[in-house]
């Protein structure tokens, strides 16, 4: 799908997970019958209801049992199925660490693990549902790619790109429905290559996920005060694009909905 102003706003209403599973997965399964989606009781929350009802043989709900979810998914991958795993970011990263470490880090099974409601998306449920350590936890596992999309359109592109990568990937989604639109026209997306959204020579703001929108708003305020700001959308946390950071500025600021330890910062 090419991004334009109209579909960018439609995808925004779905949210990142809704765009991926309500649009992307429905398209992929037509060409890739080996696609399976396993969920820890997240079909409604993740926007999977349409996929589940349309392709019931391609969807399995393991219940709220994240360790079992990864184990079952790994078994299916060993039988040449392509598996997408969906669960809350806080639980899939912490409860399933040993299983992800074993099957993705050491056995190199190319699971696509999607952690929804990352960051502070579920603050109303208390700190048990915060996910501000998930990238740091998974980042230390060998061979993992970590992606943090900034809007729903980019989430869709990240999902498609992960599909062809044939490596274990963790994609974290922050925010919910009606997420801010960063990209209103088609753009080049490549895993491991950050995107410069604004050119500047005094301050560089490097942001990821939901904080990209905040970074752009901050840059606009600073520009009005005569301060030149460079803004980078660092959608891939691992591998990190160090080339885009090579800019002569006076101050570099990182912004993320995650601990700076093990995250972008």
What kind of region is each of these model predictions?
Residues 1-172, 177, 188, ...:
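Thiamine diphosphate
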């Amino acid at each position: 799908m090419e991004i334009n102003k109209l579909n960018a706003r439609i995808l925004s209403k779905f949210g990142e997970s809704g765009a991926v599973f309500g649009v992307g997965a429905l398209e992929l399964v037509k060409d890739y019958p080996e696609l399976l989606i396993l969920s820890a009781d997240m079909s409604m929350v993740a926007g999977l209801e349409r996929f589940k009802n349309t392709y019931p043989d391609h969807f399995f709900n393991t219940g709220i049992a994240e360790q079992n979810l990864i184990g079952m998914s790994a078994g299916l991958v060993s039988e040449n199925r392509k598996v997408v795993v969906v669960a809350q970011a806080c639980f899939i990263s912490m409860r399933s660490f040993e299983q992800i470490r074993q099957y993705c880090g050491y056995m190199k099974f190319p699971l696509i693990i999607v952690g929804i409601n990352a960051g502070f998306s579920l603050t109303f449920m208390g700190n048990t549902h915060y996910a501000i350590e998930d990238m740091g936890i998974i980042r230390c596992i060998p061979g993992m790619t970590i992606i943090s999309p900034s809007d729903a359109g980019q989430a869709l592109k990240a999902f498609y790109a992960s599909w062809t990568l044939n490596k274990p990937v963790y994609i974290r989604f922050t925010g919910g429905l009606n997420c801010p639109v960063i990209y209103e026209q088609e753009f080049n997306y490549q895993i491991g290559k950050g995107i410069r959204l604004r050119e500047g020579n005094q301050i560089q703001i490097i942001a990821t996920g939901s904080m990209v929108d905040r970074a752009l708003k901050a840059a606009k305020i600073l520009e009005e005060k005569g301060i030149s700001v460079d803004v980078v959308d660092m959608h891939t946390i691992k591998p990190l694009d160090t080339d885009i950071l090579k800019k002569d500025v006076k101050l570099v600021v990182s912004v993320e909905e995650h601990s700076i330890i093990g995250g972008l910062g």
